[in-house]
Amino acid sequence: MSDTIAAIATAHGVGSISIVRLSGERALEFALRFSRKTKLTPRHATFTKLFNQNNEIIDEAIMIYFKAPYSFTGEDIVEFQTHGGFSVSEVLLEELVSLGARFALAGEFSKRACLNGKMTPLKALNIQDLILSKSALAAKIIARNMQGNLGELLEKIRTDLVKTLAFVETSIDYADDDLPSDLLEKISTMCEENSKILKEIYTLSQSKKGLIEGFKIAIIGKPNVGKSSLLNALLSYERAIVSDIAGTTRDTIEESFKLGTHLLRIIDTAGIRESKDTIEQIGVALSKKSLEDADIILAVFDASRVQDKEDEKIFELLANTDKKIFWILNKSDLENVFKNTRNKNFIKLSAQKDIALLKEELQNYLNSFDSEGIMVSSLDLINACKISSEAIFRAKELLEESSLELFAFELNLAINELARFTKDFQRDEILDEMFGNFCLGK
């Protein structure tokens, strides 16, 4: 990491300020050359003119110097706050590269921060998730993780496993010495507790992923019951074509909108019915796939039409789902001839006039989700927690069977999975645990 890297840190486009970030051993040298300054005081904002190599002014800017190791990357960093827009920051970046800097790769500043011990991979992941968060609630959950709660917990579990592995591998090396029964019991309890904690993290993260990613809602029903009108009403603008002709929507339409603090990703599906039309059949198949992916289902029926076989097909399709279903009787402002033979708790509304009741019911349901507890959004981390939990549980069973070599194998697997997000697992740690408490000179 001896080279110096540079990148524009702000979003591309027109704005009042653009930030160019420079990191590496030559960062201060380049900054002094551009500003014609002789020195920069660390952590002080310096107003200056910036010049190119032909001594032509590029811009008036503010420079901030972060001296290593007290910086984001742990290296010397200089940030240039220039005027925004498309040109100034690009010119500055090109000039930096012409002096000897290198265009930074995606995520390279964070990577250097991890390699220099300024943050764990988990924190870097949380920062990325925070940047990409789509709602205030998601940002709150991710920010809570950034405070170290999750990282500290995973590191504690990893440390417990490393210490346990040290005891067990010592026992394997000295096969004549069995592990004391009380120690075996403690190890078994530790495995059970840590496996349970990791399982709670990944199951909670999967069951409440909508709090972070946005809840996915599928609108389902036979053709021409007002699904597209309902979509438009929820979005508060016309996104889907509304027509009296059945089968107008032949593909799924997905849009996002906010309801209170929650992000909702809503899908208008093709009407489900028997059809010989190939295109419509594909649309129906996509509708059924949307049901599988959805967190919430809006099942729509037409109050102005007598219940028929196509309505029955919708009831049958949803009979065995464990998803939350809101039963909606649309067009309730017209003469109501629909018979509620299934005794469903219908929300009666008119998508073209007023859906306030549906929004209220949706918000009450979403607000019932507890945002407390440790949740993660990274699929990679969720899988790591799952793999580790299962490996630790298998290790516990193998310990009870006195299969210490296989126990050590499973524990190694769990340690390595967790280490990807906390710190690198080095085999020397096992040796440190083995001999760290020995007498001096031994």
Curated annotation (Swiss-Prot):
One of its GO terms (biological process) is tRNA wobble uridine modification. GO terms for cellular component: cytosol. Its cofactor is K(+). It is found in: Cytoplasm. It holds the Pfam family TrmE_N. K(+) binds at residues 224, 243, 245, 248. GTP binds at residues 224-229, 243-249, 268-271. It is an enzyme of class 3 (hydrolase). (6S)-5-formyl-5,6,7,8-tetrahydrofolate binds at residues 21, 79, 118, 442. HAMAP family: GTPase_MnmE. This is tRNA modification GTPase MnmE. It comes from Campylobacter jejuni subsp. doylei (strain ATCC BAA-1458 / RM4099 / 269.97). The lineage of its organism: Bacteria, Pseudomonadati, Campylobacterota, Epsilonproteobacteria, Campylobacterales.
